[in-house]
Amino acid sequence: MSNFLPFSRPAMGAEELAAVKEVLESGWITTGPKNLALEDAFIQLTGNQYAIAVSSATAGMHITLMALEIGPGDEVITPSMTWVSTLNMISLLGATPVMVDVDRDTLMVTPEIVEAAITPRTKAIIPVHYAGAPADTNALYAIAERHGIAVIEDAAHAVGTYYKGQHVGARGTAIFSFHAIKNITCAEGGLVVTDDESLARQLRTLKFHGLGVDAYDRQTWGRAPQAEVLTPGYKYNLTDINAAIALTQLHKLEQLNARRHDIATQYQHALVNLPFQPLALPAWPHIHSWHLFIIRVDEQRCGINRDTLMEALKEKGIGTGLHFRAAHTQKYYRQHFPDLSLPNTEWNSERICSLPLFPDMTNADAERVITALHQLAGQ
């Protein structure tokens, strides 16, 4: 269908092509100066002391958990309303993911829910800044400090998200994603920010074979030939081709997110006259990056269920997404946690639908979605 409106499309242009061309012509296409520039730019954005670029947010989560020495016998608290990679990384390290419920209307963990899940085995909390809105990090950090456990902010949705005047992640350790549908993208990539010098050093070692230097050394303009393996590590470094694209996108972040905000506002105004329920906005001061615009499709209220709506929109040439099916309902986790019940998560998991939202959308594109929702409501 030539006029199909996808759920998401990356906003790429001449600047990204020029950035890639520059790297290709430089003769250094793997981890190099563009990685350093990207890390420095993120430090400027978030205010953290350290930034470590990696091949994906999942890779960043893996080595952050490893650096915190999380393993067998440990518990990590995470919402089930998240992408399964977080649960997978916890499980692969031999630790136990403690999946908790979320607020029914923001789909984020609350301090009360998190504190109730803490046990003597708890080593970390992973709150998710969901859909571009910030979790209540001050309250969560207060709980973590009281119990002596780590906080790892899942900021995959949150480049450009601010909480009480600070960019998310500014207070501690956070992981960002540059996946193809994210607010800034380089197809695949991620980045960890932190103020912990020891953690940053371990992440740089773990992301590149356990070597004592990064893939690209600032002083030697290349890999130090005397580099030694300090610990077994991984191949999680980001190429400069990807880093150059991400850096170019980061320079355009304000305008990219402003366009997302405009489309989201158009949706919000339209939903006043429709039965579909958007997510509630957090009560605390914040700037939303509008990674996703999610509606809840309750059949009793809307006259149509979520799956039928998504299929009907597809037939009208409109793509949608599902973020996310609750992790504890996936086969592996269902088998390992058969008695787990998370009512708010489950209610939303059966009803959430992500509408098209990306910077290159026009107002007419958004109006097309709104018109289709009007046509389908009550069917």
Curated annotation (Swiss-Prot):
Its cofactor is pyridoxal 5'-phosphate. One of its GO terms (molecular function) is pyridoxal phosphate binding. The keyword Transcription regulation does not apply. It catalyses: UDP-4-amino-4-deoxy-beta-L-arabinose + 2-oxoglutarate = UDP-beta-L-threo-pentopyranos-4-ulose + L-glutamate. InterPro entries: ArnB_NH2Trfase, DegT/StrS_aminotransferase, PyrdxlP-dep_Trfase, PyrdxlP-dep_Trfase_major, PyrdxlP-dep_Trfase_small. Keywords: Aminotransferase, Antibiotic resistance, Lipid A biosynthesis, Lipid biosynthesis, Lipid metabolism, Lipopolysaccharide biosynthesis, Pyridoxal phosphate, Transferase. Disulfide bonds: none annotated. Pathway: Nucleotide-sugar biosynthesis; UDP-4-deoxy-4-formamido-beta-L-arabinose biosynthesis; UDP-4-deoxy-4-formamido-beta-L-arabinose from UDP-alpha-D-glucuronate: step 2/3; Bacterial outer membrane biogenesis; lipopolysaccharide biosynthesis. One of its GO terms (biological process) is lipopolysaccharide biosynthetic process. The modification N6-(pyridoxal phosphate)lysine is found at K182. Its EC number is 2.6.1.87. GO terms for cellular component: membrane. It holds the Pfam family DegT_DnrJ_EryC1. Belongs to the DegT/DnrJ/EryC1 family. ArnB subfamily. PANTHER family: TRANSAMINASE, UDP-4-AMINO-4-DEOXY-L-ARABINOSE--OXOGLUTARATE AMINOTRANSFERASE. Catalyzes the conversion of UDP-4-keto-arabinose (UDP-Ara4O) to UDP-4-amino-4-deoxy-L-arabinose (UDP-L-Ara4N). The modified arabinose is attached to lipid A and is required for resistance to polymyxin and cationic antimicrobial peptides. Homodimer. This is UDP-4-amino-4-deoxy-L-arabinose--oxoglutarate aminotransferase. The lineage of its organism: Bacteria, Pseudomonadati, Pseudomonadota, Gammaproteobacteria, Enterobacterales.
